[in-house]
């Protein structure tokens, strides 16, 4: 009785007439137990079986069965047969890069068309393209926040807002007057009147002393007339200017004469008025500050 071996199924269907000579040869009957073993036929069967495995592996397409890649059945394959690998995309070999765009929907492109992934622009470029769409309010807030930084820089322009400080030119252009607040010459001065008269006296003496020192310096320069650096150093070494201000009661008058009449500014009348009203007002008992409810009251002594 002729025995028929079952052919092992492969991924692809093998034509029927290709291996019929292997299974349906006249000598393919079962040998009797008493007959000697046929080594030549066994070797031929092993060779054909190996060739059949090679043909089956060549017909096997790994790309169609990627789910079973790396299984334990790979150990059964012949080591001499070269394996075919799927090409690795350049994006995987190049390391971390821009994120890949999602694939387009099925209805947008053709059935067999491979979607091409265009490289996305860097994040800085994307932010730069969206910057013009920001509202004007954010730009205004950014400018306001940048003002303290620009003010801290040494090269930043100074503020043009008017300040309460007086420049030296403004101080020299005023006429000086002592306070007229005391009602009579024997009345004691208040601290405010005393401070005001002190500033006026110092300003008058300073004006006259500066004028005398300037005139003395002009005379010394005209007498020596230096022409070189050595002459200037010699003049500086011997220069000694002593200023004596002895105007007496005409101190304020002589000081006011030194002021240019084109830029003269009278003393603020409000200052004198405040001093006069403070001297004429009767002394009032100062009021104690209001106490809070949580502060304990001091016991009466």
Swiss-Prot record:
Residues 174-267 are annotated as: Interaction with gE. GO terms for biological process: symbiont-mediated suppression of host innate immune response. It comes from the Viruses. Residues 113-124, 269-281 have a biased composition (Low complexity). It is found in: Virion tegument; Host cytoplasm; Host nucleus; Host Golgi apparatus. This is Tegument protein VP22. Residues 1-171, 269-301 are annotated as: Disordered. A motif (Nuclear localization signal) lies at residues 163-166. Keywords: Host cytoplasm, Host Golgi apparatus, Host nucleus, Host-virus interaction, Inhibition of host innate immune response by virus, Phosphoprotein, Viral immunoevasion, Virion, Virion tegument. Interacts with gE (via C-terminus); this interaction is necessary for the recruitment of VP22 to the Golgi and its packaging into virions. Interacts with gM (via C-terminus). Interacts with VP16; this interaction allows the formation of a tripartite complex composed of VP16, VP22 and UL41/VHS. According to a report interacts with gD (via C-terminus). According another publication, does not interact with gD. Interacts with host CGAS. Interacts with host SET; this interaction may interfere with SET-mediated nucleosomal deposition onto the viral genome. It comes from Human herpesvirus 1 (strain 17) (HHV-1). Highly phosphorylated in the host cell. Packaging is selective for underphosphorylated forms. One of its GO terms (cellular component) is host cell Golgi apparatus. Changing residue 20 to G: In strain: 17 syn+. Tegument protein that plays different roles during the time course of infection. Participates in both the accumulation of viral mRNAs and viral protein translation at late time of infection. Modulates the RNase activity of the virion host shutoff protein UL41 probably to ensure necessary levels of key cellular mRNAs and proteins. Plays a role in microtubule reorganization that occurs after viral infection by stabilizing microtubule network. Finally, may prevent nucleosomal deposition onto the viral genome by interacting with and inhibiting host SET. Belongs to the alphaherpesvirinae VP22 tegument protein family. A motif (Nuclear export signal) lies at residues 232-244.
């Amino acid at each position: 009785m002729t025995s028929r071996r079952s052919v092992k199924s492969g991924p692809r269907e093998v034509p029927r007439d290709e291996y019929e000579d292997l299974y349906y040869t006249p000598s393919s009957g079962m040998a009797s137990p008493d007959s000697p073993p046929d080594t030549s036929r066994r070797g031929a069967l092993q060779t054909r079986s190996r060739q059949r495995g090679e043909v089956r592996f060549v017909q096997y397409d790994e790309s169609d069965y990627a789910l079973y890649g790396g299984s334990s059945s790979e150990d059964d394959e012949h080591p001499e047969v070269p394996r075919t690998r799927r090409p690795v995309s350049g994006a995987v070999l190049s390391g971390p890069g821009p994120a890949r765009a999602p694939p387009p929907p099925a209805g947008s492109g053709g059935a067999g068309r491979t979607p091409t992934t265009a490289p996305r622009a860097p994040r800085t470029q994307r932010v730069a393209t969206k910057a013009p769409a920001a509202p004007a309010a954010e730009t205004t807030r950014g400018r306001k926040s940048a003002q303290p930084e620009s003010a801290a820089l040494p090269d930043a322009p100074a503020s043009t807002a008017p300040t309460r400080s007086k420049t030296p030119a403004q101080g020299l252009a005023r006429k000086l007057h002592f306070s007229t607040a005391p009602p009579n010459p024997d009345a004691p001065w208040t601290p405010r009147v005393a401070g005001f008269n002190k500033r006026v006296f110092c300003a008058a003496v300073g004006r006259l002393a500066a004028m005398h020192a300037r005139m003395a310096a002009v005379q010394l320069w005209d007498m020596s007339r230096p022409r070189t650096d050595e002459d200037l150093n010699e003049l500086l070494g011997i220069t000694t200017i002593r200023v004596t201000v002895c105007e007496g009661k005409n101190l304020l008058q002589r000081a006011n004469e030194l002021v240019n009449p084109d830029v003269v500014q009278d003393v603020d009348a409000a200052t004198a008025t405040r001093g006069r009203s403070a001297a004429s007002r009767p002394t009032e008992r100062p009021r104690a500050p209001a106490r809070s409810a949580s502060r304990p009251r001091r016991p009466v002594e």
